[in-house]
């Protein structure tokens, strides 16, 4: 790997230098060839294993943990920071630059009495969801590898430590800006320094002046809205949408007790630590706006409040348009050449009525969409009909759907197109859990198979139909904790 160290050299007050503590008996548990290509790597090697497990130095790496703050479950925490993630620097790849971080690399000045470690189960889950989201075309950070060990760590019980090697276009979060506005009061100079760095590194087409700052914030609003639109379309619940877990670039970031929907449930909660459902699936669009409002508050020393409010008022449209584009594709509806408020309203109503029917009839979200690939949209009798208990309500919806759909000249091509946008496979929590149990027993094959399937989620994989099934009774509605 070839590194540059722009964050390290230009923002010395934004981090603490800290070196990883190696894990014992490191081994490759998983590796992403796809992610490796981003930073110019090919195959995992013994030398790389020692470096990324923290046992030897990686040439060109500087090692540091960033400081930031954030709103967690609605309350402001003035000092957070990378408690168990150590960044090596910015790796220069053939087509871009990626931060390389060791998540679980050991304690840092921001560990808050924690051990700085990640357990194997959380490392495997982060790796798998990074692969899954990327191949579902959802903006996300990536994971290069999972490195296991025999190092014992204690959570609710004794587990083993592991490291996720994360790749991110940037590790700058909403919380970085909050820290230098609220926690370090009177440091508007640092806020401006961070803002200028972010624009120069990631938005080079913008200027570092008043006009550029406003254009940048609008881009952040649009990118955040687009990310959440993707989440809602694929049925992904993040689970911990604190502002310190929000990437400034609109990439899905910091995965903990996430889940993909099994049975469609608007108020689905995937986080055991969120009993009131602040971060429930259906709340995510609203939380996205709330988090952007917190970012806007932090930017008031730099951008006038009236301008910030005007930009925030564009969030809803920035969310709805990509959501409509994604959902129209899932349904096979023709794109709208000329934007129409009335057509958008009608399509949102059609989509909403369909998901309400899914919830009322307790249907699997992913499987129901996939069934469209078997549908003859010109037939009066839908193959979907038998899945619904209330067939009269379905018939009413289906008639409206056919009317909006219009004529379909090539039915096989239409069906193929539906299968290209409606995945057959998602990372169901029970599948991740089965892979984790197998790893604990020394069997990596289920993990590697699941990774392979998740990199081709739209393919049939006829030999692995079992991985597309609804969860068994024990796997229904698995809720994870933040313990990792």
UniProtKB/Swiss-Prot annotation:
Spell out the disulfide connections.
none
The cofactor named in the record is: Mg(2+); Mn(2+)
Q: Which residues bind ATP?
A: 81, 83-84, 103, 115-116, 166, 173, 254
User: Catalytic site residues?
Assistant: 244
Q: Which organism is this entry from? A: Shewanella baltica (strain OS195)
* Class of the enzyme per the UniProt entry, highest EC level: transferase
Q: Which domain of life is it from?
A: Bacteria
Role, per record: Nucleotidyltransferase involved in the post-translational modification of proteins. It can catalyze the addition of adenosine monophosphate (AMP) or uridine monophosphate (UMP) to a protein, resulting in modifications known as AMPylation and UMPylation.
Give the UniProt keywords, A-Z: ATP-binding, Magnesium, Manganese, Metal-binding, Nucleotide-binding, Nucleotidyltransferase, Transferase
The molecule here is called Protein nucleotidyltransferase YdiU
Q: Give the stretches traversing the membrane.
A: none
Question: What taxonomic classification does the UniProt entry list for its organism?
Answer: Bacteria, Pseudomonadati, Pseudomonadota, Gammaproteobacteria, Alteromonadales
Q: What is its EC number?
A: 2.7.7.-, 2.7.7.108
Q: Which GO terms describe its molecular function?
A: AMPylase activity; ATP binding; magnesium ion binding
**Family to which the UniProt record says this protein belongs:** Belongs to the SELO family.
**InterPro entries for this protein:** SelO
What residues bind Mg(2+), as annotated? 245, 254
The catalysed reaction is:
L-seryl-[protein] + ATP = 3-O-(5'-adenylyl)-L-seryl-[protein] + diphosphate; L-threonyl-[protein] + ATP = 3-O-(5'-adenylyl)-L-threonyl-[protein] + diphosphate; L-tyrosyl-[protein] + ATP = O-(5'-adenylyl)-L-tyrosyl-[protein] + diphosphate; L-histidyl-[protein] + UTP = N(tele)-(5'-uridylyl)-L-histidyl-[protein] + diphosphate
